[in-house]
């Protein structure tokens, strides 16, 4: 009763023979939460002046409070199965009935939760009553049963909940406007109480929901922006998609302005607003902001890349759009450009970060004239003018992860509606250490240079980048789902069949990288993304390195390789700092297999220093005891102490474990 809407109150009045008072109750927006506070004097104000009718109302109300009408709830458990259960609001009794329908026992070992877009919310008994007796609550159809010891739904249960949520209309919060007289009498807590709870706890592992769910709940994922702006973006994306289908290609252009909430723009420090051609001068001369980099490159590291005009057909399906199909089509006429990561400055022999004119990333960012808080035609006009602007405006959404050097946010191209993962690195956070700052910029420049070259179905696609006075943004393909490490944390170890599938895809990505002379150097579960259809994407190239083909630097007498990577996944030659080759990734791949099979990193009983010592002493990680002979042979080959004896990624693709 307490959670009845005004419409349900009207239906109840009709059922007890008081339908003549429905209009007066509706005019005063009387809902279930108000019924307990109604007395005979207040009922007279609502038109029930007859004392006998008033007493009849109070008697029926008390009966309704003691014996509420049953509702139908749908529970999800056991790998996406659903069961309908009738409930009168008793949490424990309802849970016991639901568990019995799923052939589960001991209600004390289970609890109930719901998914709300990208979040999971555990349900208390009071919140359970709210859901039961609020007929407009969308959570009634997707209550998830989870173990109390590990209160996290399985992937199948979560997928089923998302499917149901996608089919539901967005829940509307009920806004009451009571008459002044009733407002002065009823308790404030009763007037303002909200039916839906907003205390949803985000996923600890930064879940990446599918684009369809983001589209249907877009305000949840871009909470700082006004819904009208987001709706306009989706509308524009549909219109632009229709026009682009008739053209031969689409120019991604330069990423520039971030559309900021009005409050953020007011407090925003001054930013670099300059054409790309002047950026070399601006950055090179500002030696106080960008410290010199001790490591030099002679000649400067130069990488061929292409303007982000088009994308290979094999990657068209990987682009995630909000409400539209992929925009990028190959026209076969890509123009090449040079991306100079380092150049000589006028300040001695030291190198500073700079970018040549015409390179694909545009390190420009400025506040947008669009006001997310405005409801005037300004919102409508500004987005339509984007076609004349060479830089692309984008909208920052929710936090979805962390990388080697910064946090990763959900982003959206304000013109096309394309979803992106935006790796954002705050430059000011390392200003206290010039040496660390220099290394950061060095690594980021290297990451961008590598990413520009890559185009493969199992590699996260680079889209662009920009720079302003306080942070660097790297725009990457949005991969719905999550990392292998996050899935292991939530669901436990993988079956060997699934491991084979994931490792085979990872090997294809490594084969592509190694064929281009690139060593990832940080293969681990946290850097392997899995989309919601099971496709693997290798990510986070923050410490990757491009090898010089036929170089002697990895042999005796060459430059000493750096100590880079995650300790538990390091190969012996990395720990000993003797060489870095593509075989380093093969050792880490073996560690990834163990991680997937056990849901723990290699050397689980060691801390980082102990693990490094054991690796340096050529002590192999312990193999899981219940794996197949082909898995054992695969691991033995990847863990060859002599890196020259380890097979290549191409050779491992023909191994029985994955073939």
UniProtKB/Swiss-Prot annotation:
User: Which positions are annotated as binding ATP?
Assistant: 400-408, 423
Q: Disordered: where is this region?
A: 180-209, 354-387
Q: Specify whether Repressor is a keyword of the entry.
A: no
Domain (Protein kinase) ranges: 394-658
Gene name for this UniProt entry: byr2
Q: Where in the cell is it found?
A: Cytoplasm; Cell membrane
GO terms, biological process: induction of conjugation with cellular fusion; JNK cascade; p38MAPK cascade; pheromone response MAPK cascade
InterPro entries assigned: Kinase-like_dom_sf, Prot_kinase_dom, Protein_kinase_ATP_BS, Ras-bd_By2, SAM, SAM/pointed_sf, Ser/Thr_kinase_AS, Ubiquitin-like_domsf
Entries under CDD domains matching the protein: SAM_superfamily
Q: Where is the composition biased (Low complexity)?
A: 180-190, 367-380
Reactions catalysed = L-seryl-[protein] + ATP = O-phospho-L-seryl-[protein] + ADP + H(+); L-threonyl-[protein] + ATP = O-phospho-L-threonyl-[protein] + ADP + H(+)
Functional note: Serine/threonine protein kinase involved in conjugation and sporulation. It is thought that it phosphorylates the byr1 protein kinase which itself phosphorylate the spk1 kinase.
Assembly, in brief, is: Interacts with rad24 and rad25; these prevent its translocation to the cell membrane during nitrogen starvation.
Give the protein name, as stated in the record.
Protein kinase byr2
One Gene Ontology term, aspect cellular component: cell division site
Where in the sequence is the active site? Answer: 522
Tell me which residues make up the SAM domain: 4-67
Lineage from the top down?
Eukaryota, Fungi, Dikarya, Ascomycota, Taphrinomycotina
Molecular function (Gene Ontology), one example = ATP binding
Q: Which UniProt keywords apply?
A: ATP-binding, Cell membrane, Cytoplasm, Kinase, Membrane, Nucleotide-binding, Pheromone response, Serine/threonine-protein kinase, Transferase
Q: Where is the composition biased (Polar residues)?
A: 354-365
Q: EC number(s) for this protein?
A: 2.7.11.25
Per the record, the similarity remark reads:
Belongs to the protein kinase superfamily. STE Ser/Thr protein kinase family. MAP kinase kinase kinase subfamily.
